[in-house]
Every structure is written in C-alpha cells, then in structure tokens.
Amino acid sequence: MSETITVNCPTCGKTVVWGEISPFRPFCSKRCQLIDLGEWAAEEKRIPSSGDLSESDDWSEEPK
C-alpha cells in the first residue's frame, strides 16, 4: 500500500491530501487558490532575485 501524502494549504494552513481527490492542490479550495493568485498579481509575493534590476537600462531598440 502507498502512503497518503498530505500538505498544508499555503493560504490557510488546512491539511490537504496530495492526490486526485484534491483538484486544487496544494490549496484546499478554489477560494484559497484565488487568494494566492491575487497576492501574486498585486505583487505582494515575489521570487527573490540576487540580480540587479537595472540590467534593463542597457537594453535599447536602437542599434548602437
């Protein structure tokens, strides 16, 4: 028998079974999934970067 894997919902912390029984995994519900999406869209969450964000200053559409 295989062991049932569970994770915590990243939004509310509720336990979620990792499998086809949970269509919104790792979220417990569509609501928690949409809350998380909204946080990313509002830039409340971001992936840390070690690079300098000013790299785009060197980009130009005009040939040098």
Curated annotation (Swiss-Prot):
KW Zinc (keyword) present: yes
Compositionally biased tracts (Acidic residues): 54-64
Molecular function via GO: DNA topoisomerase type II (double strand cut, ATP-hydrolyzing) inhibitor activity; zinc ion binding
SUPFAM superfamilies per the UniProt record, alphabetical: Glucocorticoid receptor-like (DNA-binding domain) (SSF57716)
Region annotated Disordered, chain positions: 45-64
Keywords: Metal-binding, Zinc
Cofactors, names only: Zn(2+)
Residue sites binding Zn(2+) per the record: 9, 12, 28, 32
One Gene Ontology term from the biological process aspect of the record: regulation of DNA-templated transcription
Signal peptide range: none
The record's free-text note on cofactor binding: Binds 1 zinc ion.
Keyword Zinc (UniProt): yes
Function summary: Inhibits all the catalytic activities of DNA gyrase by preventing its interaction with DNA. Acts by binding directly to the C-terminal domain of GyrB, which probably disrupts DNA binding by the gyrase.
NCBIfam families membership: PRK00418.1 (NF001638)
Subunit and interaction comment: Interacts with GyrB.
Homology family: Belongs to the DNA gyrase inhibitor YacG family.
Designated name of the protein: DNA gyrase inhibitor YacG
Organism: Escherichia fergusonii (strain ATCC 35469 / DSM 13698 / CCUG 18766 / IAM 14443 / JCM 21226 / LMG 7866 / NBRC 102419 / NCTC 12128 / CDC 0568-73)
